[in-house]
Amino acid sequence: MAQTDDRLPQMHATTILMVRKGGRVVIGGDGQVSLGQTIVKGNARKVRRLAKGAVIGGFAGATADAFTLFERLEAKLEQYPGQLSRACVELTKDWRTDRYLRRLEAMMLVADKEVGLLLSGAGDVLEPETGVMAIGSGGNYALSAARALEDGELDAEAIVRRSMKIAAEICVYTNGNLVIETLDAA
């Protein structure tokens, strides 16, 4: 994700993929963090559990910004327990209107057993038409691969692993060090 200050190197850093299939929802993310043309870290953890394990989420963008947003989402999930959509809408409203938050540069994919959502600082709270959604510099590669695989025999986790492997082979800002979280879906 590009920084707003043109004097700083561009930050590119990830592929996050969500697949919902066969009673499971899986979010996977790679571990590469790049600053400009340099790989800074290869094993970052960009996918995690929230709300005592009831929600999984992954982020693309500036790491500190994403952690801030995860903390805010965690607070909203405590305020609206079991209501991921409501918590996300409330977070996004704050993200758009708060002077500090609106500067944050990140996107998030979050899911619980019922719904998966994409959140952005532009005010987006989007649910995918299909069971697949991706963000980040390699997101379109992973999304294309997952859509091609979703009608086959592979389960959700296998689709995530295969699609992320394909994205890592194409996108220079994505690597094969995966963190994957899974939930049983409704």
From Swiss-Prot:
<dbReference type="GO" id="GO:0004298">
    <property type="term" value="F:threonine-type endopeptidase activity"/>
</dbReference>
<keyword id="KW-0915">Sodium</keyword>
<feature type="binding site">
    <location>
        <position position="171"/>
    </location>
    <ligand>
        <name>Na(+)</name>
    </ligand>
</feature>
<keyword id="KW-0645">Protease</keyword>
<keyword id="KW-0888">Threonine protease</keyword>
<dbReference type="InterPro" id="IPR023333">
    <property type="entry name" value="Proteasome_suB-type"/>
</dbReference>
<dbReference type="Pfam" id="PF00227">
    <property type="entry name" value="Proteasome"/>
</dbReference>
<dbReference type="GO" id="GO:0009376">
    <property type="term" value="C:HslUV protease complex"/>
</dbReference>
<dbReference type="GO" id="GO:0051603">
    <property type="term" value="P:proteolysis involved in protein catabolic process"/>
</dbReference>
<keyword id="KW-0479">Metal-binding</keyword>
<comment type="similarity">
    <text>Belongs to the peptidase T1B family. HslV subfamily.</text>
</comment>
<comment type="function">
    <text>Protease subunit of a proteasome-like degradation complex believed to be a general protein degrading machinery.</text>
</comment>
<dbReference type="InterPro" id="IPR022281">
    <property type="entry name" value="ATP-dep_Prtase_HsIV_su"/>
</dbReference>
<keyword id="KW-0021">Allosteric enzyme</keyword>
<feature type="binding site">
    <location>
        <position position="168"/>
    </location>
    <ligand>
        <name>Na(+)</name>
    </ligand>
</feature>
<keyword id="KW-0963">Cytoplasm</keyword>
<dbReference type="GO" id="GO:0046872">
    <property type="term" value="F:metal ion binding"/>
</dbReference>
<keyword id="KW-0378">Hydrolase</keyword>
<protein>
    <recommendedName>
        <fullName>ATP-dependent protease subunit HslV</fullName>
        <ecNumber>3.4.25.2</ecNumber>
    </recommendedName>
</protein>
<comment type="subunit">
    <text>A double ring-shaped homohexamer of HslV is capped on each side by a ring-shaped HslU homohexamer. The assembly of the HslU/HslV complex is dependent on binding of ATP.</text>
</comment>
<dbReference type="GO" id="GO:0005839">
    <property type="term" value="C:proteasome core complex"/>
</dbReference>
<dbReference type="InterPro" id="IPR029055">
    <property type="entry name" value="Ntn_hydrolases_N"/>
</dbReference>
<feature type="active site">
    <location>
        <position position="14"/>
    </location>
</feature>
<dbReference type="InterPro" id="IPR001353">
    <property type="entry name" value="Proteasome_sua/b"/>
</dbReference>
<feature type="binding site">
    <location>
        <position position="174"/>
    </location>
    <ligand>
        <name>Na(+)</name>
    </ligand>
</feature>
